Amino acid sequence: MELTRVQTDALVIGGGLAGLSAALELRARGWDVTIVSKGKVGQSGNTIMTRNSMAAVLVEAPTSGTVIEHVQDTLVGGAYLNDRELVRKLAAKAEEGIKSLERWGVPFLRQDGRISSKGSPGHGRERIVTVDARHLRSTHNAGLALSLPLLEKAKEAGVTLLNGILITGLLKQDGTVGGAYGLDRSKPQAWVFESRVVILASGGVGKLYPLTTNAGDVSGDGYALGYLAGAKVRDMEFIQFHPTVSMVASKEVLSTAPLSAGAVLRNKLGDAFMTRYSPEGDMATRDVMARAVYEEIKSGRGSDNGGVYVDYSQVSPAKMAKEYEPIQRRLNGRSTIEVGTAAHFMMGGIVIDEFGRTGVPGLYACGEVTGGVHGANRLAGNALTEAVVFGIEAGRHAGSSRDPGASVPSTLKFTEIEQLLAQDGIYLRHDLPRVAEGNDVQAEPSLDGIKREMRSLMGLNVGIVRSGPGLWHTKEKLGQFQTYLQTYPCRRYSELLALSQLKLMILTALLITEAAWERQESLGAHYRVD
């Protein structure tokens, strides 16, 4: 198998908003920066799938309120489980993050020359601003209006961009992270990266579940990578399920913002049911909405397709055209859209401080892969704000911590790299270890079969509603999968690639399930029926 070694000042794992923001900050400080992505930098992952909404208090938007109000709403939404220092940083630096994005070429919707702001459930003031994606043909990948300008800026700045690489482990010597290693997704090739700093910005966990709003390459790798390197994780039991996902094939996420402007959730009987579940009615937070939708469907009041409806008839046509034009286009003259729930966002993750430091020397993290900002539930708009704010903070602090310029010392000999990779089943001198004659590997569970069963277990037992017996059963099965995969006999490179990916997925799924098992009370997005 071919081996490629890369030396760089900073290695950023993940090519979405958080990773690109960190990379641009590092380049501004003269650092040699490499972004490695499982998909295409700036053109894959969850950033391109977003609705482009960001929560920020802006001087030019008086109705957005104050930073203190933003902090308070975020704490209330997160059931006060949030890290308050991180929340304060999020709210205080949100405007700077928006201005940085504008400086990097990202357009925002404006009115009378000012950035427009609107309300959303969970927010007491109108602090949701939106990236202008009207120039894009499709609303399904509207986040490209956010990521493509940053991608072009990164290219102009001289950031090295490497696509199609699955990172399978972090390099760690004497307690310090100094790089990473992984596999090429298109050909039999191993990669080893040696760097002064590693920044994890690898996104969420959506593909651990059978139904998700997330992109196809978002499978929770970073949580496992950080954990294996010694980073702590927190709040892993809190998975947000989006309550308004279109039931058509595209599974497009529909903004909940119109619910603050008169839109109403209805069941198949036409009942506006949210008042049965929350005094806030249709202004309730997403965790409450998702459970309400789940209960309506479970009680037989869901649509034939297993969903409910958003009724937009009470939102004025002028407001729909001005603020919710993508939804108006999808309505196409109708007043309702059929929606359901799907795994959407991970509130928990790697523990960081306000500068993105993980506590492991040499390792930073930012964006959805981290925990602490959102607590038990995330408010709309805070995800993208978190990504840019803490991407900038991680890049800024890492870039100020050590002097760039000198080449990264090559400390690993080839034989050491060979031994390190072999621990993960990656063999450089020959393709793969031979399967013993007569060993019928076909009779064993397949990797695809294990992945399907894992997703089914996560959806059934670690989803919107959970129970002790279901969580224990899932813990046991995931542990069995983990043991089995340690000696799985790969026969070809494609199997090695799939196995390496699945090991990371199983570990992250286990971290989620164990956290859900340990928290016996219901809180935020974690709901125990027992």
How would you describe each model-predicted region?
Residues 225, 231-335, 388, 397-404:
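An anion/pyrophosphate-binding glycine-rich loop and adjacent beta-alpha core
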Residues 43, 97, 102-189, 201, ...:
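Conserved redox-cofactor binding core of oxidoreductases
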Residues 28-48:
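Glycine-rich FAD pyrophosphate-binding loop
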Residues 10-35:
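N-terminal Rossmann-like FAD-binding beta1-loop-alpha1 element of flavoenzymes
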Residues 197-252, 377, 381-397:
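Glycine-rich loop(s) and the adjacent beta-strand/alpha-helix scaffold that form part
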Residues 5-8, 187-197, 359:
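Core beta-strand elements of the Rossmann-like FAD/NAD(P) dinucleotide-binding domain
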Residues 55-90:
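Glycine-rich active-site loop/strand segments that organize a redox cofactor
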Residues 1, 5-6, 25, 40-42, ...:
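Glycine- and aromatic-enriched mobile tails/lids
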